[in-house]
């Protein structure tokens, strides 16, 4: 997945990226333009968490390993049917273009945000 994201840089031609990633690039571009890519910076540790706000929920992105929590990543990217999901593409574009919102928070909030993300990954429980 990381190798699949290599073509994305600040000087990349959008038409070329559209050919490489297809409709996922267009969706990623919309996420970028709608300011849905968030870089959380926790202080004083300096830890960073990337979140892309999707239509249904927020997705935790691990850019260093090329991972996203979304279903498209799990079903299409992991099966080799797609190079990357729209959220990973959007995060990479945002970082390369320095076009993202920075959210600064205290370190004590990191664990609760991670717990929220973990809860979102669990299947719904029956009542």
Where are these regions (language model features)?
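Long, low-complexity, compositionally biased intrinsically disordered regions
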Residues: 1-127
């Amino acid at each position: 997945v990381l190798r699949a994201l290599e073509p994305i840089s600040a000087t990349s031609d959008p038409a070329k990226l559209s050919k490489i990633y297809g409709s996922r690039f267009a969706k990623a571009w919309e996420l970028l333009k709608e300011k849905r890519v968030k870089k959380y910076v926790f202080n004083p540790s300096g830890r960073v968490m990337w979140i892309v706000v999707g239509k249904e929920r927020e997705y935790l992105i691990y850019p260093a390993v090329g991972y996203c929590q979304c279903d498209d990543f799990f079903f299409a990217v992991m099966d080799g049917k797609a190079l990357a999901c729209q959220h990973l593409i959007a995060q990479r574009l945002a970082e390369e273009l320095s076009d993202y919102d920075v959210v600064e928070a205290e370190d004590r909030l990191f664990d609760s945000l991670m717990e929220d993300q973990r809860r979102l990954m669990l299947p719904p429980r029956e009542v």
